[in-house]
Amino acid sequence: MNRRAFSTLGAPGADLDEVVRLARTGRCQGVELRCAVGQLVYPDMPATEAGRLGAALRRAGLAVPVLASYVQVAADDSGVVERLARHIDLAARLGAAQVRVFGGGADRADGRREQAVRHLARAAPLAEAAGVGLALETHDTFLTGAEVAAVLEAVGSPHAGAVWDAVNPWRAGESPERTAALLGPWLRHVQLKDVASPTDLRPVPPGHGVLPLPSVLAQLGRLGYGGWISLEWERAWYPDAPPLADALPAFHRVLDAG
């Protein structure tokens, strides 16, 4: 059985006690920590504070499969590798296994993939030294498994992998079968969610929307994927959505049925 987590994107502003309570009452063994200003974890978090938080989560019996950064690896920016290094160090202090990154680079007319490859290739040795992975999400300018796999194949490092956001490749027209086949060699983490429609991305409880979640789970089974599956409940972006605690039972029902 896959280990289950939730993203703190679903509980914006939650403190440590609230995160631990949500995990315990919500039957989750791990927490995907969103790294953003004003949140429990933030990019300039002091090393000692990060270490204390990581230790507190471990005492609570919780793992941190992913530190969800907002670093855009295809950005035309000389500071990308430095930001990656800072997030790698933060992840190591928290005990996080992966640093989630985005592609970005929407302002680049061309060379976006090459820029992402360069930045990830330069940061991969830093991740290796820290015992942390880098994981490029199917998101923004790299929505599909095809786009993410092309980057990771060119990087060619075991310390650079993929996060499969289950909605994005599907809404871009890529089937779960195709996404799984493309990302299989690099898959490090899966974000599960459901939406009202391909053009209405408001969160709905898993199994109550239009995403073919049984197909996603079937493909993960065919891959033999034994890693984490996290509920990404986007309440930070949709504040009218029900609380995360209300969505977790549906998340478990979908996984139990799969």
Briefly describe each language-model feature range:
Residues 17-18, 56-63, 73-162, 169-171:
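Active-site acidic/histidine proton-transfer and metal-coordination neighborhood
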Residues 10-12, 35-37, 70-73, 100-107, ...:
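Active-site-proximal loop/turn and secondary-structure-junction residues that shape catalytic pockets
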Residues 33, 64-66, 136, 164, ...:
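Hydrophobic residues in well-ordered beta-strands that form the structural core
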Residues 26, 30-37, 62-69:
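Short, conserved active-site loops that position catalytic residues or coordinate cofactors/metal ions
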Residues 32-54, 104-110, 201:
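Glycine-rich, proline-tolerant flexible connector loops at the mouths of alpha/beta enzymes
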Residues 1-29, 54, 58-61, 95, ...:
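Histidine-acidic metal/acid-base catalytic patches
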Residues 42-50, 76-81, 110-113, 240-241:
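Metal-dependent catalytic neighborhoods of phosphoester/phosphodiester hydrolases
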